[in-house]
Amino acid sequence: AVHTMLTELGLNRSPVDYVIERLSETLRAPVVLEDSAHRVVAWAPGPGADPGATESARTTDAGRTATVSTAAVSTATTNDAEAILAPWANLGGRDLELPEGWERVAVEARGNRWGSLTALPGKPHPAGRRTVLELGAFALALDRLADLDGDQWLELSSKRLFDVLLGGRYRHDTELATQLAASGLPVEGRVLVGATLTGIGDFGSHDSLEHAILETALRRAVAPEGRAILTPDATGTLLALLSFPPGDPRIDSGGATPPLAARLAHELSMLLPDTTPANWRAHLSLGVPGRRIGGLITSLERVRVAGWLPAVAAVGRVTVQQAERQPLAYLMRGLSATPAVQEFAENALAPLLEHDRHGGPGHSGDLQQVLQAYLAHPTNRSLAAQRARLSRSVFYQRLALIEELLGVDLADGETIATLTVALLAHGGTS
């Protein structure tokens, strides 16, 4: 029965996480799938892990020893991610020497080895724990043979982690840190940054190619010292969790252009097809770097909520917005969903928005964009007109109309501050 079930799962190309769950239920023990770099792809806690050996597993690499307490794993609650995944969180890409009572089999076929399946201590199974694990590995190997792109495991691991992080599916920060580290994103002693990356303009080819190039370029820009976990959101924007060693120059915010953006631009220049339209850009949004899990979560959430903002820097095909250099914009985008802020923005901009909604003579429909350009350069109207792509005379006429509609003086500092906040809260791009 077990053989039939697991074979059917493989032939049906059942989702990897579902296969792991069924294996865990069958063995009544935690089961972990790792890739060839020893990063956790998927895991399941099992309905009740049996207390097993109390020895420690030691993994040695170039004189360094990683100690894994199997007692901690054995006595953990069945959904204790921190205890179950701790061995993988401490590996740093090294192989794990299995403690007594653990079973591991390779996921491989036709000379390709994609990773390993590990079962933690549990009760004996009539068919044999190792036999069940081997059948599960066979089912996973069948699925990998059918995965021509070879990205399924990476996508699954990334999506799982973002679901955990953004959905609050963890009990405390150390549990989340363990899950991230086990999946290849080291946390302890690292500088952590949340970011988003999206293509702007016509790419000239299929969306899947654009996404693949953006993801590959960002991974290369972060490597080799940095680590990244990436996944697309519902709109296609690439969400990123980045981890760098302390002092890494790529996250230095002191210069006019973030070094990470320059590195990304270089990688894109090596990957983009010659047919890519000249106006296409990759827009990178960088959150505030931090050293704690809570800071990483805040960093990612703020760049997600902020959406697109005008670039503070550009290099090659890359434009950049930075939370550290645009704190007001990020703050107001974060508060824009609150009723009080929405009401403030609507009241402050109502005549202008109403004017833009109506067509006909005298209604250009671009007053919001004109105001955005002016507020970005309030002391240089010539530059603001250039940014708005209008002649100076037409631009000045639009400003006069805005002052008339809103009953304000656009040269007044308080007015500039009020309208800047209102536009940001309303979702404008100023």
Regions found by a protein language model. Give the residues of each.
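Cytosolic nucleotide-utilizing catalytic cores of signal-transduction proteins
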Residues: Q152-S430
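Alpha-helical/coil-rich non-catalytic "connector" segments in signaling and regulatory proteins
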Residues: A1-D163, E188, E225-G226, E267-M270, ...
